[in-house]
Curated annotation (Swiss-Prot):
Record GO terms (molecular function): IMP cyclohydrolase activity; phosphoribosylaminoimidazolecarboxamide formyltransferase activity
Family: Belongs to the PurH family.
Keyword field: Hydrolase, Multifunctional enzyme, Purine biosynthesis, Transferase
Hydrolase is among the record's keywords: yes
Assigned EC number: 2.1.2.3, 3.5.4.10
Organism: Acaryochloris marina (strain MBIC 11017)
Lineage of producing organism: Bacteria, Bacillati, Cyanobacteriota, Cyanophyceae, Acaryochloridales
Residue ranges constituting the MGS-like domain according to the UniProt record: 1-154
Recorded metabolic or biological pathway in which this protein acts: Purine metabolism; IMP biosynthesis via de novo pathway; 5-formamido-1-(5-phospho-D-ribosyl)imidazole-4-carboxamide from 5-amino-1-(5-phospho-D-ribosyl)imidazole-4-carboxamide (10-formyl THF route): step 1/1; Purine metabolism; IMP biosynthesis via de novo pathway; IMP from 5-formamido-1-(5-phospho-D-ribosyl)imidazole-4-carboxamide: step 1/1
HAMAP family found in the cross-reference section: PurH (MF_00139)
Protein name (record): Bifunctional purine biosynthesis protein PurH
PROSITE patterns: MGS
CDD domains per record: IMPCH
Length: 524
């Protein structure tokens, strides 16, 4: 009896070449459904349509095609079990030896919707639901379960290795190969189901507590090492459809490292605060996950030069993120400093040519610098902690000006700039700014006044007339008094201390503007 292959694919990549080999080299009989059968027929190959094979037409607009005993009996039958073989014979069912199925493009559909912008959420959800595959998962799960007798391919990238396996095995596949294929199926299904559950949760905006946490990724790249050379590391992308950094285009430079990716993500979060079209050109320079220079300017070059001047020592070997396309003038200046990575939404061809002078410099283009993970996860002994990403930014209209001195429009704009930056500095975090440029950054100190001192010391005399932002409230008035002594004229902080009145009184005494946002931005 000839061997039977069942093919039903959404992604037709490599399909014809595979079918040709199956028929011409290994004598398979092909059974196929819908568009897959049409593609095979157009290639001049013999193929039996599923509806003809089962004797049942496709119904419900194609929703039911392969859910039939002749299909699933053929897949699930254990050839080594006499009773299964007898059932096949009595029901005129032939055993299926190969299942080639890839799933409806659910992830691609929702990614396309996000890229195009969703104007009708209900219709978008309905369109996404139509891409939830039923027959495909059923077939590949059945084949994976019966991998002792059936080979299953759920990804076109497997076709070449399968044909090599047939060649070396004289037309047969080995058990280890089939086991690996079965594992691939269950990994794919876990990823697929997770994408569906995540999208439904977001689309339905459920407020119910999430009782299960599913973390599943597809290995994109084995990294040279982790934070340190003795630590192994792998880069996983969220799904089979590349998004975020997995979708970024690396124009040049060495392979990305673990630390590069961690710092790039931190840089993306900072620059995302300044991604609106009306925002001035903005540049953020980061080192070890903390901003060391953030600035805005009339041009991208001016913004970069201001950010670099904010702390040129720390910028050495840093990460640079920009909210505008890299232009030639900026590229020429970028090459004068040793940098690890640069990321921007675009890079002009002439600028890319200039940057090639630094062959090791990693230059990445990520058009969408705004979209990031909705949830952040940290591993702890015995489990994980998950929280909503800190995407809140309290607008000036919701601030409370708690001092007698009131801010000017220019001070409000400066306070907003400082507030956007301090949100992305490790706690306890203090940022001193002026002219939409960071002058001093106090990060990661165990007491707040310690971070104040570091930021002010770094700013030096430039702190005169500057603005100070704090990610958390001031427990005492010492930070306010220290800031005033350095020449700070406006402060922004969350408020919420039982001693807020002491800080307010000190600010009034010293003639400082102070705004409370009501929102804390701890970052650990």
């Amino acid at each position: 009896m000839t061997r039977l292959a069942l093919l039903s694919t959404s992604d037709k990549t490599g399909l014809v070449e595979l079918a040709q080999q199956l028929v011409n080299e290994y004598g398979f009989t092909l059974v196929s459904s819908g568009g897959t059968a049409v593609t095979i027929e157009k290639a001049g190959l013999p193929v039996t349509k599923v509806s003809d094979y089962t004797g049942s037409p496709e119904i419900l607009g194609g929703r039911v095609k392969t859910l039939h005993p002749r299909i699933h009996g053929g897949i699930l039958a254990r050839r080594s079990l006499e009773s299964d073989v007898q059932d096949l014979t009595e029901n005129n069912i032939q055993g299926i030896d190969l299942v080639v199925v890839n799933l409806y493009p659910f992830e691609e559909t929702i990614a396309k919707q996000k890229a195009q912008g969703i104007t009708d959420p209900d219709q978008a959800l309905a369109d996404a639901v139509e891409q939830i595959d039923i027959g495909g998962p059923t077939m590949i799960r059945a084949a994976a379960k019966n991998h002792a007798h059936v080979t299953v391919l759920c990804d076109p990238q497997q076709y070449a290795s399968y044909l090599q396996e047939l060649k070396h095995g004289e037309g047969e596949t080995s058990l280890p190969f089939r086991q690996a294929c079965a594992l691939k199926v269950f990994e794919r299904m876990a990823s697929y189901d997770r994408a569906i559950a995540t999208h439904l949760r977001q689309s339905l905006a459920t407020t119910d507590s999430q009782t299960q946490l599913s973390i599943l990724g597809t290995a994109k790249q084995t990294l040279r090492y982790g934070e340190n050379p003795h630590q192994n590391a792998v880069w996983y992308q969220e799904s089979d459809t590349a998004s975020g950094w997995a979708a970024a285009q690396q124009l040049q430079g060495k392979e990305l490292s673990y630390n590069n990716l961690v710092d790039l993500e931190a840089a993306r979060r900072v620059i995302a605060e300044f991604a609106q079209a009306e925002t001035q050109p903005t540049v953020a320079i980061l080192k070890h996950n903390n901003p060391c220079g953030v600035a805005q300017g009339e041009t991208l070059l001016q913004a970069y030069e201001k950010a670099l001047a904010a702390d040129s020592v720390s910028a050495f070997g840093g990460i640079v993120a920009m909210n505008r396309a890299i232009d030639t003038d900026t590229a020429q200046v970028l090459t004068k400093t040793f940098l690890e990575c640069i990321v921007a939404p675009e890079c002009q061809p002439e600028a890319a040519a200039v940057l090639q002078a630094k062959s090791n410099l990693r230059v990445l283009v990520l058009p969408d610098l705004v979209s990031g993970p909705a949830v952040t996860v940290k591993a702890i002994a015995g489990g994980w902690l998950a929280q909503a990403a800190d995407e809140t930014l309290t607008p000036p209209a919701d601030w409370q000006i708690v001092t007698q001195a009131k801010p000017t429009e220019a001070q409000l704009a400066e306070l907003l700039f400082a507030w956007k930056v301090v949100k992305h500095v490790k706690s306890n975090a203090i940022v001193v700014t002026k002219d939409h440029t960071t002058l001093g950054v106090g990060a990661g100190q165990m007491n707040r006044v310690g971070s104040v001192n570091i930021a002010l010391q770094q700013a030096g005399e430039k702190a005169q007339g500057g603005t100070l932002a704090s990610d958390g409230f001031f427990p005492f008035d010492d930070s306010v008094r220290t800031a005033a002594a350095a020449g700070i004229t406006a402060i922004i902080q969350p408020g919420g201390s039982i001693r807020d009145k002491d800080s307010i009184q000190a600010a009034d005494e010293l003639g400082i503007v102070m705004a409370f946002t009501g929102t804390r931005h701890f970052l650990h």
